[in-house]
Amino acid sequence: PYVTLLLIAANIVVFVLIQPRGGDSLEDIDRENRFLYEHAAVPCEITTGSPLTFAEITTGECGDAAGAGPVIRSEEPFFPSKNVYLAIFASMFLHGSWLHLGFNMLFLWVFGNNVEDRLGHVGYLAFYLVTGVMAMLTQLAFEPGSTAPVIGASGAIAGVMGAYLIFWPHA
């Protein structure tokens, strides 16, 4: 199950070596929040097609929450170089805690290796990524104006678990 192991390793490496986490100080919390807003998918950003402004981050109000038309912004995005669509993929490798990461990787290992054997390496990787994107689009359908970052591999792993259920319904 090479791809399953690669996905598990990638999630762990991102969490341990790239994603800031840690202390309870305001500086630590601010650093973690800045990282998430800079790299994670945010429904409001996908809805509007551009990164959040500072006002949207601090107020939690999306400029086009109601979908009533084009966004009129009086300030520049807080992270102007952020690609809001690539952030969907980045979010699949970001996790909120050791527990979040641990359970996601446990379920990926238990179900992913079997699904990978059935779909093949390339098909499985494509399936994993597509189900992760579909999970984000589902979240977007329910909360298009949310300014909270959406993180975790749970959506992609739910897709893998669904495939397992279809392939082995009596397991």
Which residues does each PLM region occupy?
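A detector for small-residue-rich transmembrane helices and their helix-helix packing motifs
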Residues: 1-171
